[in-house]
Amino acid sequence: MEIDLNADLGEGCGSDEALLDLVTSANIACGWHAGGAQAMRDCVRWAVEKGVSIGAHPSFHDPENFGRKEMDLPASEIYAGVLYQLGALSAFAQAEGGRIAHVKPHGALYNQAAREPEIADAVVSAIHDFDPSLAVFGLAKSGFVDAARQAGLVAVEEVFADRGYRADGSLVPRSQPGALVDDENEMLARTLEMVRGQRVRAVTGEWVPLNAQTVCLHGDGPHALAFAKRIRDALEAAGIDVHAPGALHAGERA
């Protein structure tokens, strides 16, 4: 049994360099919701040094709301924005001797792509046109991962240790009760169940089947680093191999 651990980095609110010792994939903000040129360069350099798979974390151009405000934009504008951000991060990866291996949209773009086919297609098209060898990280069971596969991309289904789920496999919106799981012991138990049992309990009590291929660990809490270590240690103690999906070791130098 195997699993990938990913974290959203370069957002200016966590211990990015230390977290890269614990995760196997890094989703690096591309400056549109957080971060910037220096943060991108630093995170890429650290990922290359530590052999962590490098991923782009594009978003809507919305730093005021940390990229979490849903937007109604033309597909062509979404396509152009994603392509722009991929190009920016790829330049830093190339300069540091690495390459981008995957793409995970951020915030509202992630959530809307999961349920709105037109947005999913725009994001997938930008990724495919930039580099069809890139993998796509998306919400498990979502239309976004289906769209990626239909376009011939590798889709990696993502689950969350600290988010509440609805019975259809979607995430409980952050504005609603049950959206966030705060208890570390519960998060740990949920993660092990998602990885070993391939299921999660919804806020309404049902078991929801999931194809857990990568687990997102949010790195912006005060205890994020310690909890990431607990998760990694628990997975390895359970005999689960923790590494980037497939051969996506983009942090390694050529």
Swiss-Prot record:
Annotated EC: 3.5.2.9
Keywords: ATP-binding, Hydrolase, Nucleotide-binding
Pfam families (alphabetical): LamB_YcsF (PF03746)
GO biological process: carbohydrate metabolic process
Record-linked InterPro entries: Glyco_hydro/deAcase_b/a-brl, LamB/YcsF/PxpA-like
Example GO molecular function: 5-oxoprolinase (ATP-hydrolyzing) activity
Keyword Glycosyltransferase: no
Catalysis: reaction(s): 5-oxo-L-proline + ATP + 2 H2O = L-glutamate + ADP + phosphate + H(+)
CDD domains per record: LamB_YcsF_YbgL_like
Enzyme superclass (EC): hydrolase
Biological role: Catalyzes the cleavage of 5-oxoproline to form L-glutamate coupled to the hydrolysis of ATP to ADP and inorganic phosphate.
Similarity-based family: Belongs to the LamB/PxpA family.
Subunit-level organization: Forms a complex composed of PxpA, PxpB and PxpC.
Protein name (Swiss-Prot/TrEMBL): 5-oxoprolinase subunit A 1
Source species of the chain: Burkholderia pseudomallei (strain K96243)
Organism ancestry: Bacteria, Pseudomonadati, Pseudomonadota, Betaproteobacteria, Burkholderiales
Gene encoding the protein: pxpA1
